[in-house]
UniProtKB/Swiss-Prot annotation:
Matching CDD domains: NAC_BTF3
Family, similarity comment: Belongs to the NAC-beta family.
Pfam families attached to this UniProt entry: NAC
Listed Basic and acidic residues bias regions: 164-175
Source species: Cryptococcus neoformans var. neoformans serotype D (strain JEC21 / ATCC MYA-565) (Filobasidiella neoformans)
Biased composition range(s): Acidic residues: 149-163
A GO term from the CC aspect: cytosol
Region annotated Disordered, chain positions: 1-36, 129-175
Domain NAC-A/B: residue ranges: 34-101
Protein name, as recorded: Nascent polypeptide-associated complex subunit beta
Subunit details: Part of the nascent polypeptide-associated complex (NAC), consisting of EGD2 and EGD1. NAC associates with ribosomes via EGD1.
BP GO annotations: protein transport
Length: 175
């Protein structure tokens, strides 16, 4: 070993005089998120917040039509009703309104319902334009294929209802 390396290592080993530890003690500092969390907890404690249990999800509707979604079970909600304060903990996700539609219809206010109608109209016009473009660019063959795809959603008639009605009346006469 070089004397330089040895001197460097020795200088790191002893950092003080007599009676001091020979190794450097690495102090673990409080991370900034823990420090912020402690400050937040202290501020909320001053407001007198109480935890609210049974919250499955929290949705905040933005003006641009998107939704800030906090999903369970990671959501913690604390409230101080006299000071009109709610604190929501957990990772939030920005989602489109259409992604959450079936589950949040009862949560929508008048503004959000207007946004939903606007989105539905734009979606309908978009699908109509796509169908027209496919029919126009593909010729008659593409149009027929498009009609066949649309028929998948509508069930085919199996029986004739007039004949079924006649059979039913015949059964009633026999009884």
């Amino acid at each position: 070993m070089d004397k330089e390396k040895l001197a460097k290592l020795q200088s790191q080993v002893r950092i003080g005089g007599k009676g001091t530890p020979r190794r450097k003690v690495v102090k673990k500092s409080v991370t900034s998120s823990q420090g912020d969390d402690r400050k937040l907890q202290a501020a909320l404690k001053k407001l007198g917040v109480q935890p609210i249990t049974g919250v499955e999800e929290v949705n905040m509707f933005k003006e641009d039509g998107n939704v800030l979604h906090f999903g369970a079970p990671r959501v913690q909600v604390h409230a101080a009703l006299p000071s009109n304060t709610l604190a929501i903990y957990g990772p939030g996700q920005t989602k489109e309104l259409t992604e959450l539609v079936p589950g949040i219809l009862n949560q929508l206010g008048p503004d959000s319902l207007a946004n939903l109608r606007r989105l539905a109209e734009s979606y309908q016009s978009l699908t109509a334009r796509q169908a027209a473009a496919a029919a126009g660019s593909g010729g008659e063959g593409a149009g027929e294929a498009k009609e066949g795809e649309g028929d998948d959603e509508i069930p085919d008639l199996v029986d004739n209802f007039d004949e079924a009605e006649v059979k039913k009346s015949d059964l009633e006469e026999l009884e």
